[in-house]
């Protein structure tokens, strides 16, 4: 599996709107395994995880026009571009 762990820094007063944006219209694309967004107890930046079956599926998703459009809408709610940590998941266990 391949994917990204990323931080989202919402503009002041925009966290709830950002969460709503992320909830709506976010279908898992072909090759996607799942994705998650964490709202930390310390009220810091949101933390996201996107998981794909492999790097090829991850790259194909990033290149989709719909993904770019969604990213641009998300950027309107952020102070800065997300920080991305892309790589291969080496341990995964489900309960």
Predicted regions and their residues:
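Residue-level detector of flexible, active-site-proximal loop/helix-junction positions
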Residues: 12, 42, 91
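An amphipathic, aromatic/His-enriched active-site/gating alpha helix that lines ligand/cofactor pockets
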Residues: 24-34, 51-85
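Short, charged, surface-exposed hinge/linker loops at domain edges
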Residues: 43, 86-87
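N-terminal short leaders/motifs
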Residues: 1-2, 94
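Short, well-ordered beta-strand segments in beta-rich or mixed alpha/beta enzyme
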Residues: 2-8, 34-63
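Short amphipathic alpha-helical segment that frequently serves as the phosphate-/nucleotide-binding helix
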Residues: 19-23
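Short, low-order "capping/linker" segments at domain edges
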Residues: 51, 87-95
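Short, surface-exposed ligand-recognition loops at beta-strand->loop->(often short) alpha-helix junctions
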Residues: 7-18
């Amino acid at each position: 599996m391949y994917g990204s762990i990323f931080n989202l820094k919402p503009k002041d007063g925009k966290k709830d709107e950002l969460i709503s944006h992320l909830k709506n219209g976010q279908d898992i694309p072909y090759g996607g395994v799942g994705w998650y967004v964490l709202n930390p107890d310390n009220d810091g930046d949101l933390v996201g995880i996107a998981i794909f079956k492999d790097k090829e599926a991850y790259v194909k998703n990033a290149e989709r026009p719909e993904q770019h459009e969604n990213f641009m809408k998300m950027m309107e709610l952020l102070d800065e571009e997300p920080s991305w940590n892309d790589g291969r998941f080496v341990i995964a266990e489900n309960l």
